[in-house]
């Protein structure tokens, strides 16, 4: 197990993680993030000096690219199952550390006799592993650089140590001295009763402080794991710099507890929150794949605020295993509905970075989230690209407010910054939508964000309306997330049709890219109309896969124009990208064509705009490109357009959308009628008018007073209208009115009623368009209340199954269950007793494994809590911890968890440092194991300092003369 060593020092936030060298397919990946300033170098000179920096860049071109760093870990594909993988590993001197996440036949091998870190790939007899007939593929893991997407503190910024609810400006209007901004409408979603209940969110990061007072009430150990330390405690590694604060800050945004008199309120303050500790160590393809595959049928939302270097020159993305983990998650996660991956779009704006060079935010499987300042401006760190889906508020200039959240050491902070803020915000808002409708698929969630996000006051020069009526920008995607609109739409949402993929064009003809001019290549496509299982009519994601050679990659600009005329910028110039590697099968993705028709002519435009003098003979070349369309064959919203539905939804006031809380009494205030009592006044000559004119048949015995025959003085049946609106007599009252037989008047029904028996809100017989008839209360409502669902054919509110608290479409299609029941595949089933689990195939409670106290399945590795006298170890409940581990009590858990002893101990008791036996080469000294090596340069003064400060016992000098000093007395 690699030690928890701090990352290399540097001016940027801590590194994130790693790529790998594929020995089967050849070396892959783009250039590293080195350069004159070392890893993570970020030029921060004042703007007038930026051009001076550029003058120095040609010299940097001749510098060799940074070498990859290889580890002593391998990813290996072995056929035949776990036993065969163990055999193959042992035969070649490896240790099999187990299957990689949920990737069948892929295993994590470790070799203790090779260099832990090396700039050369490993050589020696152990490399014969690749020749084993059972090995189909292997990959020595290469350290990838991954950077947390927060921005560095501004020295001019002000900080406060009282981060409370009133400081959360982005959620409410509390500042009376400035213009109020609360367009994300989170409070309105809360008022509708949505707080994230029964939804599980986990943070992929450097760990979360599970005992923080604002996180502990919602902390979920079953949604947590320490991939770096290979145990179940995701707590961050503490040091003087507090560098591992990032995950704890993100977790607080999502699910900080409410009304506990501490710090803040999370957006989904009743959701469960977990943490995957995976950034505090070497991040490899194996580490990422493991992290993305932790409990996909338990965790609903994975939030990640990290990625490759945002340095304006890196092109990098997920490796082979991580890509497979993404695909497994969206196909199998959440019982087939699909795991939801939310990603921060990147902080490289100052370096001119473009987030389409980040393969994580550029993926169709992730929701890429951007940021805006409190005043609606582009933050200085924002990266533009066509794959951004939506936006939230975050930090901006030094004089603009930042985000309040939880912090390390049980504290709070008002200094959370960057797009790191935005991903967990959206994760929290999606949790509210999943509470409203737990049956949403991963694509439903993306459709909902497209449909309900809005430009609001976000300022950008590139806002455009695409061919489907959606307003979209490279800065902000479809706009600011609207939590209330999202939950209202989610509640009544019908799943979109199945996703189709169409490879619409594939052009392998090489073309030169002329300097300054534009290379245009077109593709006329039917969008696979001839194949029913591939046909795309309505677009979702559009991917352009390209291979381009070029002497200086950063000089390229790439655009894609859809048949509807929507122009997406797939790549902008990057002044710091001096690489001559070009692009190899790199996928650029755009969401700007969402909802448009796919069929027609697509145009790819490539421009080469040199930022410096370049040899004109060295031209770039488009080697090949493919157009891949994702979408549906049927309209995703059936009978209404997304744009119209969104516009209508935003026009409705909150009270109009709110379902009634209880039955209304007839005495309540009603809609005023434009009616007046009318008594006929006799006038001279009126009798003559009655005698000489023929009145309308509906006029009563008093006749009419003209000038027209229907100007009746009284009516046979009912009068309609008033003196002001010109009264008339009718035999039947029109829709929206009822007949008052005593007064012979047509009186207006209550708002929403089409027919009624009286003016009371509880006397509706049928409803106007846009309303549902609640038959039990005889009211007309825009949304059916809890316990009822909207029957679209009858336009009635019908009762849910008795076990359902909320349901959609059908009585038994539950979204929330009553107490004593649990949700399983849309049904509410009775809670199983301790020691049993719900079998969704047999629809009954089954017995857990005898080692489990509670479980999610019958297997030994499906325990949630252990039975009495059993300890949790390596996803299993065991009677005793294995060698090198000790049992430890964990707050909130009924069982003990096996924790690893100190690296020099063979066994320990009560604490990792309380050694009872030592490894070979070490001697026990009290409770510590010290090396048997002696040293000759330890004088009396040095040894006195070691002993007086108990440095050996504290393990600060465990390898430095401890034995020599202590044996010397």
Curated annotation (Swiss-Prot):
Residues 26-39 have a biased composition (Gly residues). Residues 931-969 form the PLAC domain. The record marks 149-150 as: Cleavage. Keywords: Calcium, Cleavage on pair of basic residues, Endoplasmic reticulum, Glycoprotein, Hydrolase, Membrane, Protease, Repeat, Secreted, Serine protease, Signal, Zymogen. The active site is at 205 (charge relay system), 246 (charge relay system), 420 (charge relay system). Its EC number is 3.4.21.-. Its cofactor is Ca(2+). One of its GO terms (molecular function) is heparin binding. Each PACE4 isoform exhibits a unique restricted distribution. Isoform PACE4A-I is expressed in heart, brain, placenta, lung, skeletal muscle, kidney, pancreas, but at comparatively higher levels in the liver. Isoform PACE4A-II is at least expressed in placenta. Isoform PACE4B was only found in the embryonic kidney cell line from which it was isolated. Isoform PACE4C and isoform PACE4D are expressed in placenta. Isoform PACE4E-I is expressed in cerebellum, placenta and pituitary. Isoform PACE4E-II is at least present in cerebellum. Residues 1-63 form the signal peptide. A motif (Cell attachment site) lies at residues 553-555. FU repeats lie at residues 692-739, 743-790, 794-838, 842-887, 895-943. The PACE4A-I precursor protein seems to exist in the reticulum endoplasmic as both a monomer and a dimer-sized complex whereas mature PACE4A-I exists only as a monomer, suggesting that propeptide cleavage affects its tertiary or quaternary structure. Interacts (immature form including the propeptide) with RCN3; probably involved in the maturation and the secretion of PCSK6. Belongs to the peptidase S8 family. Serine endoprotease that processes various proproteins by cleavage at paired basic amino acids, recognizing the RXXX[KR]R consensus motif. Likely functions in the constitutive secretory pathway, with unique restricted distribution in both neuroendocrine and non-neuroendocrine tissues. This is Proprotein convertase subtilisin/kexin type 6. The gene is PCSK6.
């Amino acid at each position: 197990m690699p030690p928890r060593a701090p990352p290399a020092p540097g001016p940027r936030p801590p590194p994130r993680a790693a790529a790998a060298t594929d020995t089967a397919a050849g070396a892959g990946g783009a250039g590293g993030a080195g350069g004159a300033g070392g890893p993570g170098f970020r030029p921060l000179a004042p703007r007038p000096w930026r051009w001076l920096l550029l003058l120095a860049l040609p010299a940097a071109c001749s510098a060799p690219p940074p070498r990859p760093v290889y580890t002593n870990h391998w990813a290996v594909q072995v056929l035949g199952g776990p036993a065969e993988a163990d055999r193959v590993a042992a035969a070649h001197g490896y240790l099999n550390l187990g299957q990689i996440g949920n990737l069948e036949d892929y295993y994590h091998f470790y070799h203790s006799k090779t260099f832990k870190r090396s700039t050369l790939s490993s050589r020696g007899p152990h490399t014969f592993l690749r020749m084993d007939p059972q090995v189909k593929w292997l990959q020595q893991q290469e350290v990838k650089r991954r950077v947390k997407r927060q921005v560095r503190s501004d020295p001019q910024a002000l900080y406060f140590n009282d981060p409370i609810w009133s400081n959360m400006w982005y959620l409410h209007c509390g500042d009376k001295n400035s213009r109020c901004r609360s367009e994300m409408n989170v409070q309105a979603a809360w008022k509708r009763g949505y707080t994230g209940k029964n939804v599980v969110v986990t943070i992929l990061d450097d760990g979360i402080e599970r005992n923080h007072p604002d996180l502990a009430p919602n902390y979920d150990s079953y949604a947590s794991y320490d991939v770096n330390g290979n145990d179940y405690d995701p707590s961050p590694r503490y040091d003087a710099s507090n560098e591992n604060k990032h995950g704890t800050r993100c977790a607080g945004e999502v699910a900080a507890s409410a009304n506990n008199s501490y710090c803040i309120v999370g957006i989904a303050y009743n959701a469960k929150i977990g943490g995957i500790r995976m950034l505090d160590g070497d991040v490899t393809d194996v580490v990422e794949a493991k992290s993305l595959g932790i409990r996909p049928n338990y965790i609903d939302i994975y939030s990640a605020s990290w990625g490759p270097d945002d340095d304006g020159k890196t092109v990098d993305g997920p490796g082979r295993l991580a890509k497979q983990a993404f695909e497994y998650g969206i196909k199998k996660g959440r019982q087939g509905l699909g795991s939801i991956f939310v990603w921060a779009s990147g902080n490289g704006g100052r370096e001119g970075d473009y987030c389409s060079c980040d393969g994580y935010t550029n993926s169709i499987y992730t929701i890429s989230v951007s940021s805006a300042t409190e005043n609606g401006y582009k933050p200085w760190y924002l990266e533009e690209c066509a794959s951004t889906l939506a936006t939230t508020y975050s930090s901006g200039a030094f004089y603009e407010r930042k985000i309040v959240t939880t912090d390390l050491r049980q504290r709070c902070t008002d200094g959370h910054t960057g797009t790191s803020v935005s991903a967990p915000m959206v994760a929290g808002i999606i949790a509210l939508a999943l509470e409203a409708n737990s049956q949403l698929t991963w694509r439903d969630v993306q459709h909902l964000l497209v449909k309900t996000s809005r430009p609001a006051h976000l300022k950008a020069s590139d806002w455009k309306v695409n061919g489907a009526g959606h307003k979209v920008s490279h800065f902000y995607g479809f706009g600011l997330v609207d939590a209330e609109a999202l939950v209202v739409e989610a509640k009544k949402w019908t799943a979109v049709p199945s996703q189709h993929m169409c490879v619409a064009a594939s052009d392998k003809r090489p073309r030169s890219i002329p300097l300054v001019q534009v290379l245009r290549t077109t593709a006329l496509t039917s969008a696979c109309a001839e194949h029913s299982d591939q046909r795309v009519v309505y677009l979702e994601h559009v991917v352009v896969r390209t291979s381009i050679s070029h002497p200086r990659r950063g000089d390229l600009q790439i655009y894609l124009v859809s048949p509807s005329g929507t122009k997406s910028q797939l790549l902008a110039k990057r002044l710091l990208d001096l690489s001559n590697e070009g692009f190899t099968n790199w996928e650029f993705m755009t969401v700007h064509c969402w909802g448009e028709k796919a069929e027609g002519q697509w145009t790819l435009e490539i421009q080469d705009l040199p930022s410096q003098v370049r040899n004109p003979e060295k031209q770039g070349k488009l080697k090949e490109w493919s157009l891949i369309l994702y979408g549906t064959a049927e309209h995703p919203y059936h009978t209404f357009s997304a744009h119209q539905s969104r516009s209508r939804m935003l026009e409705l006031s909150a009270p109009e959308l709110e379902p009634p809380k209880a039955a209304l009494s007839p005495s309540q205030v009603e809609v005023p009628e434009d009616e007046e009592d009318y008594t006929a006044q006799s006038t001279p000559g009126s009798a003559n008018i009655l005698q000489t004119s023929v009145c309308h048949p509906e006029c009563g015995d008093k006749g009419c007073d003209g000038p027209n025959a229907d100007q009746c003085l009284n009516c046979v049946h009912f009068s309609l209208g008033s003196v002001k609106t010109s009264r008339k007599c009718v035999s039947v009252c029109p829709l929206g009115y009822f007949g008052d037989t005593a007064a012979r008047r047509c009186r207006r029904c209550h708002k929403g009623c089409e027919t009624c028996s009286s003016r009371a809100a509880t006397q509706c017989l049928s409803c106007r368009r846009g309303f549902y008839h609640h038959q039990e209360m005889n009211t007309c409502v825009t949304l059916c209340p809890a316990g009822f669902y909207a029957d679209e054919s009858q336009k009635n509110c019908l009762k849910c199954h008795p076990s359902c608290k909320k349901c959609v479409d059908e009585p038994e299609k539950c979204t929330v269950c009553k107490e004593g029941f649990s949700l399983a595949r849309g049904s509410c089933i009775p809670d199983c007793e301790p020691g049993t689990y719900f079998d969704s195939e047999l629809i009954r409670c089954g017995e857990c494994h005898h080692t489990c106290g509670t479980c999610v399945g019958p297997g030994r590795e499906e325990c949630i809590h252990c039975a009495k006298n059993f300890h949790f170890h390596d996803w299993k409940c065991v009677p005793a911890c294995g060698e090198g581990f000790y049992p430890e009590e964990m707050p909130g858990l009924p069982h003990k968890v096996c924790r690893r002893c100190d690296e020099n101990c063979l066994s320990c008791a009560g604490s990792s440092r309380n050694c009872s036996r030592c490894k070979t080469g070490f001697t026990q000294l009290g409770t510590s194991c010290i090396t048997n090596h002696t040293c000759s340069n330890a004088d009396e003064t040095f040894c006195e300092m070691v002993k007086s400060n108990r440095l050996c016992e504290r393990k600060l000098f465990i390898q430095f003369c401890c034995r020599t000093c202590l044996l010397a007395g």
